[in-house]
Structure formats: C-alpha cells, structure tokens
Amino acid sequence: MSVKKKSKILTLFKRMLVFMLSVVLIWICFHHIMKLVERDQYPAIGKYIQVENGRMHVYTKGNGPNTIVLLSGLGTASPVLDFEPLMNEMSTHNKVVVVEPFGYGWSDMTDEKRTVEHIVGELRSALQQLNIPGPYVLMPHSVSGMYSMYYAREYPEEVKAVVGIDATWPAALDYFNETPPSMPGYMRYVAPAGLARLAISLDARNYLPLASEGTYSDKNLAMTKAITAWNAYNENVVQETNELGDNVKKTAHISFPSDMPVLFFSREDDRVREDGKSLFTFLQTQLTDHPASTIIPLQGHHYLHWTQSKEMNEAVLKFMNDIEDRE
C-alpha cells in the first residue's frame, strides 16, 4: 500500500472519529438542555422536606383513620408516579404518603451511604417532619420489604401493620441460597451521558408501567420518561444496589414483632424447587402470630400495583377491619 493511500485512509479515519465524537457531544449537550426544559415543565407535584443535607420529595393524598406509607422498589424512576393508581384507590379511605428516597423521582442526591440504617432514618425523619402521627401502615414494594422489616423491628410503636407488595424479605436469599444483585459503577454515567434518554427514545416500553391503557395518564407517562432520562441508574441507585449484600447481612436474623399484623401480596407462582421450597413456603415462614396475618397471591408483574390496585385496596381495607375487630 502506497504512502499516499495510507495517508488518505488515516485522514478518513480521523474525520470519522471527529464526526462521531461531535455527535456524542451534541447529544450530551442536547440531553442536558432538555433536562433543564423538562425540570421547568414538570415541577415536583408534592412538597420538599429537608432531611440531613438534601431535600426529599413527599406526596400525600386522602384522609382516613390509617396512614399508609408506600415504599418503592429498587431503581423505580419516580415512586410518586409509579404508585399513582394505588394511591388513587387507597386514598378514598386512608391518608396515603409516598416519600421518594434520595436519588429517586424529584428528590435530591445524597452523599450518605445507602445502608439500611440511613435509608430508614431518612424515611423516618421525613415522616416526622410531615407532622403526620403514627403508627403507620408500611406498604413496601420489592427491596423496601427489607427496610420495612428493619423499621418495624427498631420502632415497633410507630408501625401498626406491614403490607408487602411482592416484597423482598431479608431471609429470602439464605432460604433460596441466592446471592444479592450488584451493579457496575460505570452505570452511574448512563443518565449524565444521555444514554438513558437515548434508550427511552428508541423504545420507551421497557421503562414504563405494563398496565392497560388509561391506568396511567399521558402526563404521568411523560413525566416518568423525563425523570428516567434524568435519574436512571444514578449514583445513589448504584450504591444502594451494591449495598444490598451488607444490608441483608445486617437484617437476615431479624423478623417482624410476633404480634404485628402483616399481609403479603405475592405473584401467583406454582413453581416448586426440587428441595420442596417455593415462594409460598418461604412467605409462610415470615408470617407473624397475629390472627389477621395472611398471604394473598395475585396474578401480575412484580409491580403488582400496575394491574391489581383495585383488588389490593379492597384486600387492605378488609385486612385493616380484621385488625380493628380483634383489638
């Protein structure tokens, strides 16, 4: 190959490299401009509570004899938006509260480690500053089950009951001999680099609730897409994921107080392992001695509230009535 031809190829390669870098930089700039526009277009729908050195976004709806605190699963873009159908159902008879943890929804980021102690402490501080008296009905989804159990064990006088939404309880990993998930540190750059926005632009279905049309409003879905573009896999979510192993070790030995009523919503799952263990047999080990404690299997996604909000609301009303009848 002649020197002249090599020079042309090298020049072409350099131009292509410059072009690709330019496209990347333009996209990153576009993402951050859109982020500013969207933050102005979609302001927080609740109110901010100052906790430690940051602001936590809190949303409340309804009134009633019970205060139900909805707690989100790991990495949920905006718990307030995600729980909207369930809030709408439950707020007809109860006060419903959603506290978005640091790194979620409209809440700030935090430098505090994502230990179970810090996460529960921040939640508790936010609830206290709302001046909403307990005891609360904690209603955790997924990994928040672990935080709820810790809260109930440390502060039993502040918890009236716990209702799990396909929740993760600390003893599950040991029971099924599984390991906690982890997330590579570089994932924290997905949102700042505009990659989350790109993924949503290409196929938003993977980032939106799998619910029937009309369950979530168009505005809700638009805000969910925007917040996902801002926050997906952010540093706090990555830290929380990688802290799960230690958090499970801290909580694996604890259980709910024996007299605390608990209700477990779980996905219908008929699978039984060779050792005879199943989701149902595990949940039976987590039930308390309270006569109202029970397990209710439901058809649906891990995010059961996407499709079963009405059924869940009716079951919780019955559950709370059973508790009151036995007091």
Task: Describe the residue ranges of each PLM region.
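Conserved serine/cysteine hydrolase catalytic core
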Residues: 216-289
